[in-house]
């Protein structure tokens, strides 16, 4: 596949993610496409089922505040040193979103089941926790190879869309994600993967032995958009730092405002 077949504008990328889609998103520290999130908010997407791989932060809070989300499936929603996620917290208190509590190992294991094409996967660590009472789709059963050894069976988790950011893509649609291997799992598990990248380079990343091991092959990528500082106001490792002033301003405003969109460093919009 050549990039001409998969290269999209940011609004075209957002239009490829339908209302009601199950969308896998990485945590704040792992190459988030905030530029795509803002595009989704601009087009007023509705009814999203967000999957945190394994947790969520600013992306989810922004989408919830804009009224784009029906369901969250994640191990946590946190803004790290910025504190609680204000729009998420308000939505939960008002019972405006459906929460599917999970754990980090459960999210990763269920995605691995989808990646491998198997219908379910066993996991031990959930037994004895209260979370099982809230996840009727998780079943406790016997280990078929041992006696008196219960395990939890998790159904495969197959997102409709994985949405990520990355430092580099190439004209063949290959995407280099570096050490952030959860993006690779997301792309393998999801039906489609859309990526924003800092730069589209000449050549083939799969031909470079130093880059190949950390590159998602283009066959897993449904669309790619070149977006400089596409993770802003978050940062990317080895690229640019998070815009702490802007993030704090968001947190302060989001405590009382429902809608957040932003396309420039000096542009924060909210609607009471």
Regions found by a protein language model. Name each.
Residues 185-188, 192-262:
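ATP/nucleoside-binding phosphotransfer catalytic cores, i.e., glycine-rich phosphate-binding loops
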Residues 70, 158-160, 191, 222:
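Conserved acidic residues
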Residues 94-151:
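Internal, conserved structured core segments that host functional sites
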């Amino acid at each position: 596949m050549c990039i001409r077949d998969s290269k999209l504008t940011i609004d075209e990328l957002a239009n490829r993610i339908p209302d009601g889609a199950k969308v896998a998103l990485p945590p704040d520290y792992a190459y988030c496409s905030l530029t795509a999130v803002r595009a989704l908010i601009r087009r007023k997407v509705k009814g999203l089922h967000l999957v945190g791989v394994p947790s969520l932060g600013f992306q989810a809070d922004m989408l919830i505040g804009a009224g784009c989300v029906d369901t969250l499936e994640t191990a946590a929603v946190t803004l790290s040193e910025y504190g609680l996620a204000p729009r998420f917290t308000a939505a939960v208190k008002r019972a405006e979103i459906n929460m599917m509590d999970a754990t980090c190992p459960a999210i990763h294991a269920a995605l691995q089941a989808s990646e491998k094409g198997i219908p379910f996967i066993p996991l031990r660590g959930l037994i004895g926790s209260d979370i099982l009472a809230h996840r009727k789709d998780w079943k406790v059963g016997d280990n078929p190879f041992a006696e008196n050894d219960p395990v939890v069976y998790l159904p495969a988790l197959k997102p409709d869309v994985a949405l990520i950011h990355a430092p580099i893509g190439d004209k063949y649609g290959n995407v280099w994600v570096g050490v952030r291997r959860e993006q690779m799992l997301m792309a393998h598990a999801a039906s489609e993967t859309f990526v924003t990248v800092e730069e589209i380079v000449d050549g083939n990343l799969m031909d470079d032995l130093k880059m190949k091991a950390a590159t998602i092959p283009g066959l897993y990528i449904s669309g790619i958009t070149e977006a400089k500082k596409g993770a802003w106001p978050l940062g990317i490792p080895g690229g640019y730092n998070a815009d702490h002033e802007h993030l704090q301003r968001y947190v302060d405003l989001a405590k009382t405002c429902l809608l957040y969109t932003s396309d420039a460093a000096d542009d924060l919009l909210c609607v009471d």
